[in-house]
A protein has these predicted regions:
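Conserved ABC transporter NBD signature motif
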Residues: 27, 58-74
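The feature captures the beta-strand-to-loop junction immediately N-terminal to the Walker
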Residues: 36-38
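Helix-to-loop junction immediately C-terminal to a conserved catalytic motif
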Residues: 51
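ABC-family P-loop ATPase nucleotide-binding domains
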Residues: 83-138
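Catalytic Walker B motif of ABC-type/P-loop ATPase nucleotide-binding domains
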Residues: 151-155, 160
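ABC transporter nucleotide-binding domain
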Residues: 167-256
Length: 300
């Protein structure tokens, strides 16, 4: 299995502020990787380092077999879509398509026109007059027209309503299917339910550090929620890694990374979903920043 992204001890400082610290992650090719964490966790910083838009303070980063760099050969392989949707509001989608053809050697203008026609998005209206969901679709179609091998998406659906998000993610998964295994995606978002629908890999950041990285199904299988009486849990803690614990007067609830079978009959073990896993590693609702990850998702 080839690797699309690999970092070792990657760090980035802005004067006295550490934006990313000791970041070591691996993302195989042909994956949709969820990049998740509260505001200020370092998600945008990591994406910019992967895209070659920023230089690391320390550590190493390897993207598609080489170091990110600002040269045409590397940039042709990378699609980067910023959260603010970088479109010229007075230009039409057709204007953007023609400009892209002059700037990108592998430009696929037909794919943009086809995707936008399928979505009933007009080519000859100024993009500033389109809805937020339509602008996001135009930006994604233009980014995909580069035919990148790595697509970096920085919270592209943050301002969209649930239906527009669903359409956007549908376009993304269709592009993956059409790529023939030649596309890897890193999708940054606060919306855990959306990520759970389309992603098969995860990078979880908190406080500028990597908390979790790996295949989602594998990680879910390695974790359980254990619920039982409030008592000494030292035996459980020796057998398993306790990620998060909630104790009441009568009951203990543990999120654990399994170190083997659960032998204690007093505890009931249940599977975890992605939201439980993410919030467990981030300390559940311990800080206001974590509430973003549930409150926004409840809009669906």
């Amino acid at each position: 299995m080839n690797t699309a992204i690999e970092t070792q001890g990657l760090s980035k400082r802005y004067r006295r502020v550490t934006a990313l610290s000791d970041c070591s992650v691996t993302v195989p090719e042909n994956r949709i990787c969820a990049l998740i964490g509260p505001n200020g966790a370092g998600k945008t910083t990591l994406l910019r380092l992967l895209a070659g838009l920023s230089r690391p303070t320390g550590g190493t980063v390897c993207v598609l077999g080489g170091a990110p760099r600002q040269d045409p050969a590397f940039l042709a392989e990378i699609g980067y879509l910023a959260q603010e949707i970088p479109l010229y509001r007075r230009l039409t989608a057709e204007d953007h398509i023609r400009a892209g053809a002059h700037l990108n050697p592998r430009w696929d203008a037909l794919s943009v026109r086809t995707r936008l026609a399928d979505l009933n998005i007009p080519l000859n209206r100024a993009v500033g007059t389109l809805s937020g969901g339509q602008r996001a679709q135009v930006a994604l179609a233009l980014t995909l027209a580069k035919r990148p091998r790595l697509l970096l998406l920085d919270e592209p659906v943050a301002a969209l309503d649930p239906l527009a998000r669903r359409h956007f993610l549908g376009t993304l998964t269709a592009a993956m299917a059409d790529s023939g295994g030649e596309l890897t995606v890193v999708l940054s978002s606060h919306l855990i339910a959306d990520l759970e629908r389309v992603c098969d890999h995860i990078i979880l950041l908190a406080e500028s550090r990597v908390q979790l990285c790996g295949d989602i199904d594998t990680l879910l299988g390695e974790h359980k929620v254990l619920v039982g009486p409030r008592k000494n849990t030292s035996a459980l803690e020796r057998a398993h890694t306790v990620v998060h614990a909630v104790r009441t007067a009568r009951q203990t609830t543990l999120l654990v990374r399994l170190g083997g079978p659960v032998f204690d009959p007093a505890y009931e073990a249940s599977d975890v979903d992605l939201e439980e896993l993410v919030l467990g590693y981030m300390g559940a609702s311990a800080t206001p920043a974590l509430a973003q990850l549930t409150a926004i998702g409840e809009e669906q």
